[in-house]
């Protein structure tokens, strides 16, 4: 299979900071019938993020947006931003997204999604 045809799957786990996050794809029908969501971050051990598998399998901008959205919930939780001021929040998200994009297991999937579209 040529490099252009390579399929990069969403990883099963992403390690970021002190957390190892399990990524779980759930059937579209379950996501929408249970609570009308596309993704859900669970902020209690073991930390998990649930994704509508239909959106993830379609790939592209919607999938990237969904994944980044749910990981931003993790960043909010990880950096305890609930009662923080703007500069602290912006700095925390800058640090979190840099780690997510540059050093996590998600990097290859994100790059593949960007390059194929």
Where does each model-flagged region fall?
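Long, well-structured alpha-helical subdomains associated
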Residues: 108-117
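Active-site scaffold of zinc-dependent metalloenzymes
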Residues: 10-61, 74-78, 82-96, 117
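Short acidic, Pro/Gly- and aromatic-enriched capping/linker segments at domain boundaries
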Residues: 2-12
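Acidic/histidine-enriched, beta-strand-rich ligand/metal-binding domains
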Residues: 99-106
């Amino acid at each position: 299979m040529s490099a252009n045809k390579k399929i990069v799957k969403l990883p099963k786990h992403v390690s970021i900071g002190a957390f190892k996050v399990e990524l779980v794809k759930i059937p579209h029908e379950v996501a929408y019938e249970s609570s009308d969501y596309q993704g859900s971050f669970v902020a209690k051990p073991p930390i998990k993020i649930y994704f509508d598998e239909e959106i993830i399998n379609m790939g592209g901008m919607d999938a990237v947006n969904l994944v980044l959205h749910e990981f931003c919930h993790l960043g909010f939780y990880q950096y305890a931003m609930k009662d923080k001021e703007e500069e602290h929040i912006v700095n925390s998200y800058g640090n979190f997204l840099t780690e997510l994009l540059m050093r996590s297991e998600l990097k290859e999937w994100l790059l593949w999604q960007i390059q194929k579209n």
